[in-house]
Regions:
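Metalloprotease/metallohydrolase-associated module, dominated by Zn2+-dependent proteases
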Residues: 2-7, 12-88, 117-191
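Generic "edge-of-domain/loop-turn" microfeature
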Residues: 43, 95-97, 113
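Short pre-active-site segment immediately N-terminal to the catalytic Zn-binding motif
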Residues: 89-106
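Active-site recognition of the HExxH zinc-binding catalytic motif
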Residues: 103-117
Length: 191
């Protein structure tokens, strides 16, 4: 018998809250100002994206940036009465078809992009290739131990049942699958 409903983004938000609470590296993250969303992609294509962080501010938390003589701003986004600093998109079904540990690696990867100042900007890793600082593999090594420690913890919680479910298992287990969906915001000309 199917359960009535699951909100995928709410469950992932709760997992992120656990990460921020249990990991010193992510303690600066205010989960109430990070909106988790679903995006769609084709399940049968190889490679591709599992998750994406969208910062809602520019370098050093600036609200505007001048580019080619024009002034740009990101749209302001309020959720739950709070202005959001970041959006994190997880791609359905691709992300959900990963094994549990790989899902957590994607979540940690996207969270690590959040600036330590939590100012709406990304963590800058260098002058060139600022997002990953060169090789992505090295980027993922920066939080690899924390992923393993968190996985050891989460395996003892009810969240592991969710992490073990792929897209088919979710569809088979719930009458309704929901989550926040929104078009990815882009900078707009303000002057």
């Amino acid at each position: 018998m199917k359960l009535p409903e699951i909100n995928l983004t709410d469950v992932i938000t709760l997992i992120i809250q656990e990460i921020a609470h249990r990991s010193e590296t992510f303690a600066h993250i205010d989960v109430h100002r990070v909106l988790v969303c679903l995006a769609s992609n084709r399940s049968n294509s190889r490679g591709g994206t599992f998750g994406k962080l969208v910062p809602l501010r520019f370098k050093d938390g600036a609200e505007t940036v001048r580019y080619r003589g024009r002034l740009y701003a990101m749209p302001r986004l309020n959720h739950g009465g709070l202005e959001q600093r970041y959006l994190i998109y997880f791609y359905h079904p691709r992300f959900f078809n990963l094994p549990p540990l790989e899902k957590l690696k994607v979540v940690f990867h996207e969270l690590y992009h959040i600036s330590p100042d939590f100012n709406g900007d990304v963590r800058r890793m260098g002058k060139r290739k600022a997002l990953h600082g060169g090789l992505r593999e090295r980027f993922d090594e920066l939080f690899e131990e924390e992923v393993r420690e968190f996985y050891a913890y989460i395996k003892k919680t009810p969240y592991i049942k969710f992490l073990n479910m792929n897209a088919h298992a979710l569809k088979s287990s719930f009458k309704k699958i929901s989550g926040h969906r929104m078009k990815m915001p882009k900078p707009v000309v303000v002057g």
